[in-house]
Amino acid sequence: MSSENKEQHDLSPRDLPEEAFGFPSELPLETQRRSGTDLRQSETGHGRRAFRRIHMELREKPDTDIKQFVIRELQKSCQCSAAKVRDGAFDFFPVLRWLPKYDLKKNILGDVMSGLIVGILLVPQSIAYSLLAGQEPIYGLYTSFFASIIYFLFGTSRHISVGIFGILCLMIGEVVDRELHKACPDTDATSSSIAVFSSGCVVVNHTLDGLCDKSCYAIKIGSTVTFMAGVYQVAMGFFQVGFVSVYLSDALLSGFVTGASFTILTSQAKYLLGLSLPRSHGVGSVITTWIHIFRNIRNTNICDLITSLLCLLVLVPSKELNEHFKDKLKAPIPVELIVVVAATLASHFGKLNGNYNSSIAGHIPTGFMPPKAPDWSLIPNVAVDAIAISIIGFAITVSLSEMFAKKHGYTVKANQEMYAIGFCNIIPSFFHCITTSAALAKTLVKESTGCQTQLSAIVTALVLLLVLLVIAPLFYSLQKCVLGVITIVNLRGALLKFRDLPKMWRLSRMDTVIWFVTMLSSALLSTEIGLLVGVCFSMFCVILRTQKPKNSLLGLEEESETFESISTYKNLRSKSGIKVFRFIAPLYYINKECFKSALYKKALNPVLVKAAWKKAAKRKLKEEMVTFRGDPDEVSMQLSHDPLEVHTIVIDCSAIQFLDTAGIHTLKEVRRDYEAVGIQVLLAQCNPSVRDSLARGEYCKKEEETLLFYSLSEAVAFAEDSQNQKGVCVVNGLSLSGD
């Protein structure tokens, strides 16, 4: 560091030029300078300080008549023109804006490369995650295929990859298992031996035409949940209630994903060991599942266990190498696909299913099944479950969209993103698909391999189409334990969040506690309950932060006329007889007592002063045996003429965002207590909302509006000016003589 830079770095606030400090009011710069000059102390002929009040004229409020507002909005909405229709179409289908302007030479190579890589990664992941959702492998491929095409049409992000997502598959799987258990409570037969009806199920020797087996009923449940989640997401976009996502903080989402990852890991452990276990339901399913696993550990399939260990030994180091050399590799090595191909060949030629009873994926049909509407009769059963799924889906999608848009210097429309992800669920639900959302891991791969636009999603869809039409049956011999390993290895990112905890603790202890509470409740209770607990606990933490907020007395840095905390900064001077108090939170029913006690403790407690005056008066009466007429309180005041060190309390309201009824009553009470002992209370830097609340709450009369000031300097100057008027302190027009 050069000596010049070091010298600037070591400057104290007093040494900095005056322009470096902002005037504490919300006035334009010229007004601030003029006001600062007017408010500086100057001596008149009588030795008194000149004081000039700042006046601001309120703008006229717009007409708030609800009827007229509705009529205006309806008229605006019903106006139709060619330009408005075109803009509406372009807004609803963003692809119409950017596709005609597509730069083929600049973008095509990166889009094709990223689309191919993501498509190759999606094939094994789609098959693996479909098992997590309790579905056949083909439905996972359908889901990723349709989601890629639909987001291409409706999405505004250039980089995110939308498709099948592990956390949502877990939540879908829990609903599917619950509904299957309701329909078939007394049987654990395979899908080929169960015919499921709305009223229950029966065991049959073979699949009959017109009957819905376990697999068929499972996708009915999954597609119905997906349809409802999409409806919720589109409705939230239509009513512009995306603000719901603000209650899902980064710490909460991270903790939820990590906790759900433990549930996913637990659900896949049985595949790694080759155990045939029913999925546990309800609260504490993770613990119950591990109890079942350890009780049946002696039944472990050695072939599946060895295959799982070999796959782990290949996938984990390969993932680490991909991460370590991602800057040097033009594209990540598709290790998952290599493992799937190798494992399929080994299983097929080694006849692992026949010789060692290893569980395999089984028949995967080619082509597309005829579209079919969701089962409307299931909507009452799954409507509540779809709420949590829809919120998680759109929150992750919108946050990833905004993150990558900010990184690459463009904008996304959060409302349109909700439409996009909603239609990615509604439309595919008629084509035997499950819920989708954006996924961080695939989005990072997509970005790092040169993606420029969502044309890469079409390339990804073509790769999946090739698999659906030609390659899918070749995965017949693929062991389910391999798919379980792929699912678990892809949880690395979420499970490694534990490494970030020390840094998170240093940044915010409250966020760390939120992370832990959400993670533990999601893992040990259930994903839905964990999300609800996380949201409720986060809101409780917000309330807790405002219940005991920071507050301080302020001092003046004279050269800049800036007021700051005396406990934080050095070389600040307090004005004689004036206490400036700052409260950093909204003033409402939760923290009103905290505000009052902090002010009385740091400035002066008028209740104790008044009590001391009464006590002194009574003692003096006893000593001198003097008889007074009148009220005892008046007697106390008349006998106590010792001047107080404080004559004015200035409350800095700049950090008070709003007041409620309790807050207004508290300010009135504080003002009444201080005026009872001859101290005036002034409010400074109130925002328009607070001023409006004070006016509606009748904090002061029309002639008492002089108690509200636009800046601290103005309030302090007024206090000094009123005190200097021949030693008389003026309180709301009442003079209290000091002799």
UniProtKB/Swiss-Prot annotation:
Glycans are attached at N205, N357. One of its GO terms (biological process) is sulfate transmembrane transport. Residues 1-17, 31-46 have a biased composition (Basic and acidic residues). The modification Phosphoserine is found at S12. N-glycosylated. It catalyses: oxalate(in) + sulfate(out) = oxalate(out) + sulfate(in); sulfate(out) + 2 chloride(in) = sulfate(in) + 2 chloride(out); oxalate(out) + 2 chloride(in) = oxalate(in) + 2 chloride(out); bromide(in) + chloride(out) = bromide(out) + chloride(in). Its main location: membrane. GO terms for molecular function: secondary active sulfate transmembrane transporter activity; solute:inorganic anion antiporter activity; sulfate transmembrane transporter activity. Keywords: Cell membrane, Glycoprotein, Membrane, Phosphoprotein, Transmembrane, Transmembrane helix, Transport. The chain crosses the membrane at residues 112-132, 137-157, 227-247, 255-275, 378-398, 420-440, 455-475, 524-544. Residues 568-719 form the STAS domain. GO terms for cellular component: apical plasma membrane; microvillus membrane; plasma membrane. The keyword Membrane applies. It is a multi-pass membrane protein. PANTHER family: SULFATE TRANSPORTER. Belongs to the SLC26A/SulP transporter (TC 2.A.53) family. Sulfate transporter which mediates sulfate uptake into chondrocytes in order to maintain adequate sulfation of proteoglycans which is needed for cartilage development. Mediates electroneutral anion exchange of sulfate ions for oxalate ions, sulfate and oxalate ions for chloride and/or hydroxyl ions and chloride ions for bromide, iodide and nitrate ions. This is Sulfate transporter. It comes from Mus musculus.
